Amino acid sequence: MESLLLARLPEAYVVFSPIVDVLPIIPVFFLLLAFVWQAAIGFR
């Protein structure tokens, strides 16, 4: 039962692989956005 579920999960997530590839970049993007925003306000 578990082996069937584990075998079927990767095939189900093939559709979401581009989204999963982008997900680790999103926190870095928000961190850079917050840093630029604080720098712009600080240098005003």
UniProtKB/Swiss-Prot annotation:
Chief site of localization: plastid
Keyword terms of this UniProt record: Chloroplast, Membrane, Photosynthesis, Photosystem II, Plastid, Reaction center, Thylakoid, Transmembrane, Transmembrane helix
GO BP term (any one): photosynthesis
Subcellular location: Plastid, Chloroplast thylakoid membrane
Propeptide residues, chain positions: 1-7
GO cellular component terms given for this protein: chloroplast thylakoid membrane; photosystem II reaction center
Source species of the chain: Trieres chinensis
Membrane topology type: Single-pass membrane protein
Family, per entry: Belongs to the PsbK family.
Transmembrane regions: 23-43
Function, as annotated: One of the components of the core complex of photosystem II (PSII). PSII is a light-driven water:plastoquinone oxidoreductase that uses light energy to abstract electrons from H(2)O, generating O(2) and a proton gradient subsequently used for ATP formation. It consists of a core antenna complex that captures photons, and an electron transfer chain that converts photonic excitation into a charge separation.
Name listed for the protein in its UniProt record: Photosystem II reaction center protein K
Subunit relationships: PSII is composed of 1 copy each of membrane proteins PsbA, PsbB, PsbC, PsbD, PsbE, PsbF, PsbH, PsbI, PsbJ, PsbK, PsbL, PsbM, PsbT, PsbX, PsbY, PsbZ, Psb30/Ycf12, at least 3 peripheral proteins of the oxygen-evolving complex and a large number of cofactors. It forms dimeric complexes.
